[in-house]
Amino acid sequence: MKPTKPEGPKKPNKSNEEAEELEGDNKEDLEGPKKPNKSNEEAEELEGDNKEDLEGPKKPNKSNEEAEELEGDKQKDKKDGIFVLNYDDEYEEDLEYDDEYEEDLEYDDEYEEDLEYDDEEYDDEYEEDLEGDNKPHKEDLEGDNKPHKEDLEGDNKPHKEDLEGDKQKEEEEKQKEEEEKLKDCPWHWFHQIYPKHWGCPHRKHRDRKSVPAKERELVPAQSTKRDTDPDSEASLKSNYAHLWVHCKLCSGFNYKKILKSKNNVCEQCGSHLKMHSSDRIDLMLDPKTWAPMHEGLLSLDPIEFHSEKDPYKDRVASYKRKTGLSEAIQTGRGYLKRIHLGIGLMDFQFMGGSMGSVVGERITRLVEYATNRVLPLILVCASGGARMQEGSLSLMQMAKISSALSDYQFNRTVFYVALLTSPTTGGVTASFGMLGDIILAEPNAYIAFAGKRVIEQTLNIEVPEGSQTAEYLFDKGLFDQIVPRNPLKGSLSELFNFHGFVTLNSQVINIYNYLYS
């Protein structure tokens, strides 16, 4: 009998339905997700690729000789036993498993298609992002290349501490030099009180050039508390400062008693300093002939001016204590070289000589008194203008005084002299200051209607320096004469004598005072 071929393990028979399902699944897996509208050419290319994937890798074609060799080997193996055939069958099963693995590979092909799909969208965007990252920002390059201004300025500028140290050394050296120079001065006691010897009466320092106020260095104000050490510089200044008067024009110091005897005229530069109204009475009138008038008229608060920090009534009371006056003007009658006259003197130290309702009323009553008695009249002007705390009432005093002066000058036998001192501004300049029969002014007096600062702020123009001084205005014909303070009394007596006002002897003066007292 012929040996029968042993049958290996039978492969599972797959029904037609399962085969069709597998074919359908394979087709769907191979086709993958449908891409948006593709052209016919792309569709043909995809079909070609799918066919190759289905067929899988082509097996090499074996020739007839190789087939015969394989059959011969199988016959030899039959003689050896069934073990080899069973091994081959297992190998075939492994091959079947590999076929399943090929199906997995087909799934991998779909994954490759997904990667291709991702490359089309994501990779393109990513390349753009890379291009943006590769290009450096201009702002960053400019910021890195340009050095910071603060660093350059900081490197170029020297340290403040070094500069301050150098300045201190220079100041100390200057102080030592000045102290050595001042040791030889016989007025050494003067320099202990005022280290800067601008006002030193010694000949070595009298010819020293004056420095204008604008060019001088500002010195911080010192505390009013006196030091415990009586020999210290601060204590000397606080103890003896009330004995000296500082001249702003030449920065000189004048001893008060000497300055008063010279009618407040600076010894160094001859400038006319501000003068108290009581001192002017002593300057212009004969001794013991002054008789004040209308002292009972006092300032009230007619418009109830509101001020939280400094109420109007309190401010008036404080100026009364400081100056010893009841208002910004003193009015009365007296004798100048035995000539009986009426006189009014404004005081700038009382609220800047501002003209309020009481000031206007006193001047008006003085003018009316001179009109009734046919007396010559003198008004000394020193004012900053109308008093703002009284509003329109202070402005009305300009019209009231001008009206009284019009009645006074209607009589041709009387004579009105206006004396303008520094400063005379505002409503006083615009009213009785410029209505005199003769207008006199002191040297270098500041006379204007509006101040320099106000004009520059309102009109936006520059006011020339010196355009508001008495000398400049005299050249323009605004005044009749500029009279210094010392010969003022003699000049006034000549004017009165020239206009027919004769001097009276002592007996006539006594009778006149008895009748009109």
UniProtKB/Swiss-Prot annotation:
Keyword check for Magnesium: no
Cofactor dependence: Zn(2+)
Residues that hold Zn(2+) according to the record: C247, C250, C266, C269
Disulphides: none
EC number: 2.1.3.15
SUPFAM superfamilies named in the record: ClpP/crotonase
Catalytic activity entry: N(6)-carboxybiotinyl-L-lysyl-[protein] + acetyl-CoA = N(6)-biotinyl-L-lysyl-[protein] + malonyl-CoA
Annotated region (Disordered), positions in chain: 1-179, 204-234
Keyword Transmembrane helix: no
Gene Ontology cellular-component terms listed: acetyl-CoA carboxylase complex; chloroplast stroma
Family per record: Belongs to the AccD/PCCB family.
Cross-referenced NCBIfam families: accD
Protein name: Acetyl-coenzyme A carboxylase carboxyl transferase subunit beta, chloroplastic
Underlying gene: accD
